[in-house]
């Protein structure tokens, strides 16, 4: 830091000529002693507010700070380089949710196969359940991509064999299948809430944000949509109304 120093008063008095402008005093710059700040520098570094505390002016020294953080970069080739603040409980909970989504996809695929039979031939229901199966599989893949993104390891688990027959003596196959779908969506929603709870308990804001933004809102919409389908199918009964409902599903956009 350089300070402006004026020479002695005697040296500063120039020879004044009649009518000539005064010569400005020379300015000499000298280095301030180490550890001593000029008043203007101190004022520039004062904290906002009451202005009583003088700050150092240094906010972040990256190369100094990362020296103590190099342990965060693993040297072993079998360790993830991207993993940071991602605990084992969250990794395990994500793998469980992947399994939930794949099981839901498998169950919907079985419903699709049933309604696509030649002796059932409700193509609208088959289309709806096929799209639902694809959606659940996409959810599983999205969770797998996120697991890899955070440096976790995807561990696929067994899938339970689903039902293959969905006829019901009182409700009929259409209503019974849609009630099963509603129960399945509520179960998936419950599992997502459990995953969110694990992320919250482990203080993982990135995972909680991912679940909220990518899954929970969509899950609520799916529950509401299928709830309305169940209500409508209860009104139409097992007769001719099921065919009309099937046509509605066939024409509906995904």
Curated annotation (Swiss-Prot):
Induction record: By iron.
UniProt binding sites for Fe cation 1: 101, 136, 139
Tagged with keyword Iron: yes
CDD domains noted in UniProt: Euk_Ferritin
Catalytic activity of the protein: 4 Fe(2+) + O2 + 4 H(+) = 4 Fe(3+) + 2 H2O
UniProtKB keywords: Chloroplast, Iron, Iron storage, Metal-binding, Oxidoreductase, Plastid, Transit peptide
InterPro entries listed in its UniProt record: Ferritin (IPR001519), Ferritin-like (IPR012347), Ferritin-like_diiron (IPR009040), Ferritin-like_SF (IPR009078), Ferritin_CS (IPR014034), Ferritin_DPS_dom (IPR008331)
Annotated region described as Extension peptide (EP), given as residue ranges: 47-83
Cellular-component GO terms for this entry: chloroplast; cytoplasm
Main location class: plastid
Distribution of this protein across tissues and organs: Ferritins accumulate in seed during maturation. Then, they are degraded during the first days of germination. Present in roots and leaves after iron treatment.
Segment annotated as transit peptide: 1-46
The keyword Chloroplast is annotated on this UniProt entry: yes
Similarity comment: Belongs to the ferritin family.
Subunit structure: Oligomer of 24 subunits. There are two types of subunits: L (light) chain and H (heavy) chain. The major chain can be light or heavy, depending on the species and tissue type. The functional molecule forms a roughly spherical shell with a diameter of 12 nm and contains a central cavity into which the insoluble mineral iron core is deposited.
Name of the protein in its database record: Ferritin-1, chloroplastic
Source species of the chain: Zea mays (Maize)
Lineage: Eukaryota, Viridiplantae, Streptophyta, Embryophyta, Tracheophyta
The encoding gene: FER1
């Amino acid at each position: 830091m350089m300070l402006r120093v004026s020479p002695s008063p005697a040296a500063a008095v120039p020879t004044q000529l009649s009518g000539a402008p005064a010569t400005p005093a020379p300015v000499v710059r000298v280095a301030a002693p180490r550890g001593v700040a000029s008043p203007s520098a101190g004022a520039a570094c004062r904290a906002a507010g009451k202005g009583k505390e003088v700050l150092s002016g240094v906010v972040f020294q990256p190369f100094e700070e990362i020296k103590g953080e190099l342990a965060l970069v693993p040297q072993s080739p079998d360790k993830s380089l991207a993993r940071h603040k991602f605990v084992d409980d969250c990794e395990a909970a994500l793998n469980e949710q992947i399994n939930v989504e794949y099981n839901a996809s498998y169950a919907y695929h079985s419903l699709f196969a049933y309604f696509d039979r030649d002796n059932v031939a409700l193509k609208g229901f088959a289309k709806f359940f096929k799209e639902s199966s694809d959606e659940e599989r996409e959810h599983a893949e999205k969770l797998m991509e996120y697991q890899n993104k955070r440096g976790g390891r995807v561990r696929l688990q067994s899938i339970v064999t689903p039902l293959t027959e969905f006829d019901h003596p009182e409700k009929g196959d259409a209503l019974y299948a849609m009630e099963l779908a509603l129960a399945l969506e509520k179960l998936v929603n419950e599992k997502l809430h459990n995953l969110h709870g694990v992320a919250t308990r482990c203080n993982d804001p990135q995972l909680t944000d991912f679940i909220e933004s990518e899954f929970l809102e969509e899950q609520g919409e799916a529950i509401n949509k299928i709830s309305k389908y169940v209500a409508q199918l209860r009104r139409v009964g097992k007769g001719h109304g099921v065919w009309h409902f099937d046509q509605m599903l066939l024409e509906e956009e995904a």
